[in-house]
Design a protein with these regions (language model features):
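Active-site metal-coordination/substrate-binding segment of hydrolases
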Residues: 71-134
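Acidic-glycine-rich active-site phosphate/pyrophosphate-binding loop
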Residues: 83-98, 162, 177-189
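Acidic, glycine-rich active-site loops and adjacent beta-strand->loop/helix elements
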Residues: 55, 78-79, 101, 136-145, ...
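Metal-dependent amide/peptide-bond hydrolase catalytic core
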Residues: 53, 186-396
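N-terminal helical capping/dimerization or prosegment-like subdomains
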Residues: 2-85, 257-261, 278
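Phosphate-handling active-site elements
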Residues: 98-100, 120-135, 159-161, 216-226, ...
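Acidic/histidine-rich catalytic neighborhood of metal-dependent amide-processing enzymes
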Residues: 110-184, 395-396
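A structural signal for isolated positions on well-ordered beta-strands in alpha/beta enzyme cores
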Residues: 48, 73, 134-136, 301
């Protein structure tokens, strides 16, 4: 990072810089992290980094205000989804302003929020008193909330953890009290190859995979029809779907291998472990015995691809009321997408989700955020500072 070049100071200018870093989850985010680290250092703020095992990606954490005191954490992820194959009308990594909007990959999800936080740093430094503000920016949220786990593990070793966390995912600045959790699995079915004229001598991996997929489909229908239901969510029940299948080499060859990926998006109150146990029990007790009657070497293997918990809003009533007061929106919402909030909540750090922009613009070509949304988030930061700077500030 060239620290001889003046850093931008406005939200829009900072966002332009953040967008210029291609932080697709498959790439390193270190250039962006080093830029944030240098930006904070220029303002006298010390950062700490936690890296992935390869040292190619990092989270950044910083505290503005007194050390060793629990404060409000402002959290977001630095990675973005790919642009490959999407029909963008301009360079996705160059911020373009048009019709009261700024376009670029990550504008809504969620570098707009990070830009608002960074633009507010000088004001935070001037105004914070007894209660600090913490900044937490992670890597690889888009591929299963991977990076934040290392950040939280580091926080768990500290004498004091944050009082609460605001996750800045796009909610149009409404306060979201909860969201569903998710688990994604890859299932590998290993059969026995052979000539298709002699099907009785082989074990058709695709057909047995279909038995498992049908079981998942039936379970999904049961959840839809019998619940449990929570009308705060859309849809109001936990869902199961198979999203990818591959297997076989030719129509006249008994397929030796088939693999498929499925996911469960579950209500925060649902027991997802029990759901997974049902599927694995069906594989173990019904599918594998049929396969192994022909060849004992056949079998079914489950591999978890990604997982994050739902956000229940446990212990967050004070935080919810406080943030609703800051936004001016008294009606809280729930989210159909996931965030890192449930992982903070699992550490007994109350969490809500509130940030600028709309999830409807995320992951799409010509992703954008309205300038009015950035202005609302800027105002939120100032109001947050005013509130926490008051003597004796408490959330409850």
């Amino acid at each position: 990072v060239n620290t001889s070049v003046p850093f931008p100071s406005t939200t829009r200018a900072i966002l332009a810089q953040l967008i210029a870093f291609d932080t697709t989850s498959s790439r390193s985010n270190l250039d962006l992290i080093r830029w944030i680290e240098a930006y904070l250092a220029q303002h006298g703020v010390t950062s700490s980094l936690t890296f992935n095992a390869e040292g190619t990606k990092a989270n950044v954490y910083a505290t503005i205000g007194p050390a060793g005191v629990a404060g409000i954490c402002l959290s977001g992820h630095t990675d973005v989804v790919p642009t490959t194959g999407q029909p963008w009308t301009a360079d996705p990594y160059t911020l373009v302003e048009r019709d009261g909007k700024v376009f670029g990959r990550g504008t809504a999800d969620m570098k707009g929020f990070i830009a608002c936080v960074l633009a507010a740093v000088p004001a935070f430094l001037a105004g914070v008193r007894e209660v600090p503000l913490h900044l937490a920016f992670s890597y690889d949220e888009e591929v299963g909330c991977v990076g934040v786990r290392g950040l939280l593990a580091a926080l768990a070793k500290e004498p004091v953890k944050p009082l609460a966390v605001i996750i800045g995912e796009p909610t149009l600045m409404h306060v979201a009290r909860g969201h569903k959790g998710k688990q994604a699995y890859r299932v590998v079915v290993e059969g026995r190859a052979g000539h298709s004229a002699l099907t009785h001598l082989g074990v058709n991996a695709i057909e047995y995979a279909c038995d498992l997929i049908s079981f998942l489909r039936n379970k999904a229908n049961t959840l839809r029809d019998e619940g449990p239901h929570d009308e705060a969510y859309e849809p109001a029940y936990s869902t199961i779907q198979t999203g990818k299948v591959s297997g076989g080499i030719a129509v006249n060859v008994i397929p030796e291998r088939c693999e498929f990926d499925f996911e469960i998006r579950h209500l925060p109150s649902d027991d997802v472990v029990a759901m997974i146990d049902e599927v694995s029990a069906f594989a173990r007790e019904t599918v594998e015995p049929q396969m192994r009657a022909v060849d004992p070497a056949c079998g079914v293997h489950f591999q978890r691809i990604s997982a994050y918990p739902g956000l229940l809003g446990r212990g967050a009533h004070g935080l919810q009321r406080f943030c609703c007061g800051l936004t001016g929106f008294q009606d809280m919402i729930t989210l159909s997408f996931g965030t890192e909030g449930g992982l903070f909540e699992a550490m007994d750090i109350p969490a809500i989700v509130c940030g600028p922009g709309s999830i409807e613009q995320a992951h799409r070509p010509d992703e954008f955020i309205e300038l009015d949304q950035l202005a609302r988030c800027d105002a939120f930061m100032q109001d947050l500072l005013t509130a926490v700077a008051k003597p004796g500030f408490k959330l409850d």
